[in-house]
Regions:
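Conserved SAM-binding loop of SAM-dependent methyltransferases across substrates and taxa
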Residues: 134-146
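Conserved class I S-adenosyl-L-methionine
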Residues: 123-134
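N-terminal auxiliary segments of SAM/dcSAM-dependent transferases
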Residues: 1-87
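Class I S-adenosyl-L-methionine
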Residues: 240-277
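Conserved beta-strand signature within the Rossmann-like core of class I S-adenosyl-L-methionine
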Residues: 231-239
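A short glycine-rich, Lys/Arg-flanked "PGG" loop and its adjoining helix->strand segment in the class I
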Residues: 216-230
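Conserved SAM-binding motif I beta-strand of class I
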Residues: 148-153
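S-adenosyl-L-methionine
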Residues: 154-195
Length: 277
């Protein structure tokens, strides 16, 4: 069992219980996955994994993890600030330099991923997950009965976030039966090493065009067509960029390139759904 993750609502609930002299509260220490009885003391509070000090400062939109002697934000400062961010739904999103990587306005990012996974019908299929992120696409595929998933993630920092996020699937978990392979690497390069027609379905959730233009290129789409079997489905997340401010219609540009690569494509949800011809 992992050490607790603390957010501002949990921190405030702990302090309020201490103020009122309540000996226990029912709370989630893993971002909403489970709930447990939490003991409230004057200087420390405790759950199933031990007792912990109260935070002196707790910021909104921040998740704190236990390092062994103190709580620290789940964030890393390297080439960019990569941060796990709580949501009202439970499953967190993440940000890179303040840019939110997953939709959270209307639905949980986990549920959003589950809906998109359903478009490619992964049951019994071998799935390529090009940009793994927090692993919510992979989790949806595992849940839906995919035969196997190969997932790439370029960022070492994002992979670190996954180790602390209780909603991210663990490739080594016995219940997954070895069906998830998580590989660190740049999929724009690694895809060239994948076999022809090696997958029945593809989920492509790249960073925005301005950050990772190579993942929207004709050359990359040609590679997606090469590794996908005929009749296989691809969902390509594009978001809904403002055409008036960007001067581009990214979803339709993507559709045209996919058609050229050998797909039949149409707009679906906040992206493009395509089938290999």
């Amino acid at each position: 069992m992992a050490a607790p993750l603390v957010t501002l609502p949990l921190h405030e609930a702990l302090l309020e219980a201490r103020r009122r002299g309540v000996p226990h509260i029912d709370a989630s220490l893993d971002l909403g996955r489970t709930r447990e009885a939490v003991a409230i003391g004057e200087h420390r509070w405790g759950g199933a994994t031990g007792t912990y000090p109260y935070l002196e400062t707790c910021r909104d939109r921040t998740i704190y993890h236990w390092t062994g002697d103190r709580f620290e934000p789940v964030a890393r400062y390297g080439d960019a600030l990569v941060k796990l961010v709580p949501t009202e739904w439970g499953p967190p999103t993440f940000e890179i330099d303040g840019i939110k990587m997953l939709p959270t306005a209307k639905v949980s990012p986990f549920e959003d991923a589950r809906t998109k996974v359903g478009l490619v019908e992964p049951r019994g299929r071998r799935v390529l997950d090009t940009c793994g992120g927090l692993g919510y696409f992979a989790a949806g595929c595992l849940e839906a009965g995919a035969a196997g998933i190969v997932s790439f993630e370029k960022s070492e920092d994002v992979l670190w976030l996954r180790t602390l996020n209780p909603w991210s699937p663990d490739p080594d978990a016995p219940e997954h039966g070895g069906r998830l392979q998580l590989r660190q690497g740049d999929v724009s390069q690694e895809i060239e090493r994948l076999p022809d027609a090696g997958f029945n379905a593809i989920l492509h959730d790249p960073p925005r065009f301005g950050i990772a233009g190579e993942l929207y290129s004709q050359a990359f789409y040609d590679q997606l067509a090469r590794v996908l079997r005929k009749g296989g489905r691809l969902f390509h997340y594009t978001g809904s960029p403002n055409r008036l401010t960007s001067g581009r219609d990214v979803p339709r540009e993507v559709s045209r390139r996919l058609e050229k690569a050998g797909f039949q494509a149409r707009l679906a949800l906040d992206g493009v759904l395509a089938q290999r011809r």
